[in-house]
């Protein structure tokens, strides 16, 4: 019998997977071509960076083990992997690059053999500060109003169109400028099942003026209804900026503000059809971050030089760069992309297959959203059976363990443990070796 040996690690799990770059000394200039994470690391050393530590520290800890690990086991062969947890931050270059790549690949696999249209909906500049303080409220209303505007005229003709709405919050130079891109294939489905194609911009059931009026009308109606809503929960409370508190406190002032917004122009830009290659459109709206590592030119004398969305060079102090980047943080677990109409999640596969059959085109291969197959047996699916949290605490997923067809014997011991130090030495070393594979 193997004795139970208490393993006293200077146990900080993250040490196993510390990133392979050195911290920069205070007086050392950042390398000419730094990453966004390296710029953040440099800034967070600043004693005045306190407001941003919580937001960006988890980005720096992403994939290092400091956020813990998850244990995955193949439900067919029992292959085991222990993978550092990702941060899932809306501002993490690693997480969002991977999310965007997977989303773009899947959407390209679903493209229909018809022209595609891009429509951009923008909020008035006068709503920018209010939006900054109320992202979840405004973005929810924004999605609802854009979808209502897109559906109104086709709905009147008993036609169901399909479209994707993608929220982007940035303009050039990292300024906060929330707007929505709508990607729509030029085809609709009538209630009798027949297809209705839109080969040109003129053939569409709406134009920019129709879309703008409906967008403005629905948005302001929803915003006003939210203002007068009773018994709202924490996420629904309107946060008024200091310069707008009088509007929030006085009903007459609020109605006057709504009236002023009604008089303003609400921009809608309806583009020409994309005949040749809608892949570029999908790639563009699939972007998740306001800036990528590729846009960073360098850092010198405390300033970041980067290329903006218009391919112009911009120079900002590191502090201003981080502050502008922080403005694009999304509410927790907020989804920036939504599908509507015949492209909604419950209808998409059937609709795409049906349209392709009608048009005589091969059916696209629709990939799984998250690749989770076993790389060893090529047959099983990797299931998360547990978490190893900071400090070695263990949390088990009983449901997935029961789904395993080939269950490793060590799982029974793992189920009884509260912490890695509760495990017998052989199993502890086995798990630590699996963690070390991602060093």
Residue ranges with predicted function:
Residues 1-439:
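Beta->alpha loop/short-helix hinge microenvironment recognizer with preference
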């Amino acid at each position: 019998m193997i004795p139970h040996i208490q393993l006293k690690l200077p146990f900080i799990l993250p040490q196993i997977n510390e990133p392979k770059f050195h911290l920069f000394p205070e007086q050392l200039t950042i390398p000419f071509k730094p990453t966004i994470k390296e710029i953040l690391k440099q800034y967070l050393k600043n004693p005045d960076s306190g407001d941003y530590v919580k937001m960006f520290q988890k980005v720096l800890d992403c994939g290092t083990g400091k956020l813990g690990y998850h244990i995955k086991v193949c439900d067919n062969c029992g292959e085991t992997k222990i993978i550092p947890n990702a941060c899932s931050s809306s501002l993490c270059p690693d997480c969002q690059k991977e999310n965007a790549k997977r989303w773009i690949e899947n959407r390209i696999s679903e493209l229909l053999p018809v022209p595609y249209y891009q429509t951009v909906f923008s909020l008035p500049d006068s709503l920018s500060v209010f939006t900054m303080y109320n992202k979840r409220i405004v973005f929810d209303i924004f999605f609802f109003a854009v979808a209502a505007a897109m559906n109104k005229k086709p709905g009147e003709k008993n036609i169901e169109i399909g479209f994707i709405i993608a929220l982007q919050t940035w303009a050039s130079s990292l300024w906060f400028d929330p707007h929505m891109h709508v990607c729509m294939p030029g085809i609709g489905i009538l209630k009798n099942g027949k297809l209705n194609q839109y080969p040109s911009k003129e053939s569409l059931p709406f134009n920019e003026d129709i879309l703008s009026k409906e967008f403005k009308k629905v948005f302001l109606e929803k915003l006003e209804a939210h203002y007068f809503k009773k018994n709202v929960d924490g996420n629904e409370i309107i946060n008024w900026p200091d310069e707008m508190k009088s509007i929030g406190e006085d009903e007459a002032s609020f109605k006057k503000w709504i009236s002023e917004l009604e008089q303003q122009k609400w921009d809608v830009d309806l583009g020409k059809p994309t005949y040749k290659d809608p892949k570029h459109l999908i790639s563009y709206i699939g972007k998740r971050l306001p800036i990528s590592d590729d846009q960073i030119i360098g850092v010198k004398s405390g300033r970041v030089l980067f290329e903006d969305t218009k391919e112009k060079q911009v120079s900002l102090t590191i502090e201003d760069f981080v502050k502008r980047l922080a403005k694009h943080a999304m509410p927790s677990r907020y989804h920036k992309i939504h599908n509507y109409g015949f492209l909604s999640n419950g209808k998409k596969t059937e609709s795409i297959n049906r349209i392709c059959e009608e048009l005589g085109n091969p059916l696209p291969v629709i990939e799984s959203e998250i690749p989770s197959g076993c790389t060893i047996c090529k047959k099983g699916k990797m299931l998360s059976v547990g978490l190893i949290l900071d400090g070695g605490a263990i949390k088990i997923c009983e449901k997935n363990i029961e789904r395993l067809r080939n269950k490793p014997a060590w799982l029974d011991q793992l189920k009884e443990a509260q912490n890695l130090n509760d495990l017998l030495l052989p199993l502890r070393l086995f798990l630590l070796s699996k963690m070390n594979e991602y060093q």
